Amino acid sequence: MLIPHDTRIALDTVVDLVNTAPEEDSGGVGSTDGLGDVEALYAFVRTHDISGVGNDLGNRDLRAVLNVRARFAEVFEAPDARSAADLINQLVAAAGTTPQLTDHDGYDWHVHYFAPGASVADHLAADCGMALAFMVVAGEQERLRRCEAPDCGHAFVDLSRNRSRRYCDSRTCGNRLHVAAYRARRKEAAAG
């Protein structure tokens, strides 16, 4: 699947954004929120090189980004392309999507979908929403997945050739489960 560079970056950003949400572990104790305060939001903006975001982010921006994050999480949970499309349409419409070609900061020509001067939440909703729209239009909505490891659930985009990826990369969940299954088989064989 050929994905333009700017779309790939936006897909990586939306996955990272969704994965900042706290998880419930098996003991019922929640993990920390990766966007728990404005400083964490600044760090996210810097890490993902989000352009056009000023230095005056505040609690209102944080609340708006958390709302957008929750909507993106719903896209990853959508049971079908129509449901995903409806969610994405709402996000990009609310963001006031305004496509424009740009080249900046050493990046070649690419499309920004957010309006000039848009808030960080609208920026994320527009650019990341359009990247998710690209996946739906390409008939690839099923590539927007959650990790199948019982104690994970992180979002990821399955870009494998045969759409077979089941686990995220962030915790090497697949390796952990394969090792656990191997050890269980060895233990069973030794007992039998």
Language-model-detected regions and their locations in the chain:
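Short helix-coil boundary/hinge micro-motifs
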Residues: 1-146, 150-157, 191-192
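Short alpha-helix boundary/capping motifs
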Residues: 100, 116, 160, 175-176, ...
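Juxtamembrane/interface motifs at transmembrane-helix termini
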Residues: 107-108, 166, 184-187
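Residues immediately within or flanking Cys/His clusters that coordinate Zn2+
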Residues: 144-149, 165, 170, 176
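Short linker/helix segments within small regulatory modules
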Residues: 158-165
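Basic DNA-binding region of bZIP-type proteins
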Residues: 171-189
